[in-house]
Amino acid sequence: MAGHSQFKNIMHRKGRQDAVRSKMFSKLAREITVAAKTGLPDPTMNPRLRLAIQNAKAQSMPKDNIERAVKKAAGGDAENYEEVRYEGYGPGGVAVIVEALTDNRNRTASNVRSTFTKAGGALGETGSVSFSFDRVGEITYKLSAGDADKVMEAAIEAGADDVETDEEGHTITCGFEDIGEVSKALEGALGEAETVKAVWKPQNTVPVDEEKAQSLMKLIDNLEDDDDVQNVYSNFEVSDEVLAKLSA
């Protein structure tokens, strides 16, 4: 399992999700507003908005918050957010990609660079690490959607590329350009997905020891704590033994 997925699971087990719920809702609302502003405010006519709302619902974001975020874009009083990607290296030479929605590029770049530096890493140029990742669609379902065989069959029929099933649920990947078509086909076979999004998937992973893993997780935690940062991806991998220690 890639490092950031492991990190998410550890934080979930430690209850971190509850501590950052307000910040998470704020970021989800920002994505909804940007999606509504860049297209039509109707999710049936705006694929990006539909996915943003779907993901917000999956995180139990209140309906009022979702509607308010859409109306903010329709009312024309929304800030002008810009999509920015930062790339760099964390401790141990691990590649890290940071996606942000910001109304001030200088502020965000300064914050992200400082976070990398404090962690013993370095912010690089755009393209410095993304060549070692693939941009893919990721669709997740809870285990209750069906057993591994059922989900695999549905994924093949839908035109997906891969399926991974573990104790957290089913993760289906597909081509970036095929997200809408594949997710729609899966919805017909398995019901509404838990999340549907575009992600950066590492082509290869870098194994790290416990010390490096702790440093990397702190880096990711600090990056995600920035209001402008929407997503963080990395290519490190932790052994089951180290994972058990970090999860304790």
From Swiss-Prot:
- Where on the tree of life does the source sit, at the highest rank? Bacteria
GO MF terms listed in the record are: DNA binding
Presence of keyword Lipoprotein: no
Which keywords, in A-to-Z order, does the entry hold?
Cytoplasm, DNA-binding, Transcription, Transcription regulation
Annotated GO biological processes are: regulation of DNA-templated transcription
SS bond list: none
Q: Does the keyword Metal-binding apply?
A: no
Q: Where in the cell is it found?
A: Cytoplasm
A GO cellular-component term linked to this record: cytosol
What residue intervals traverse the membrane?
none
* Similarity-based family: Belongs to the TACO1 family.
Protein name according to UniProt: Probable transcriptional regulatory protein R02753
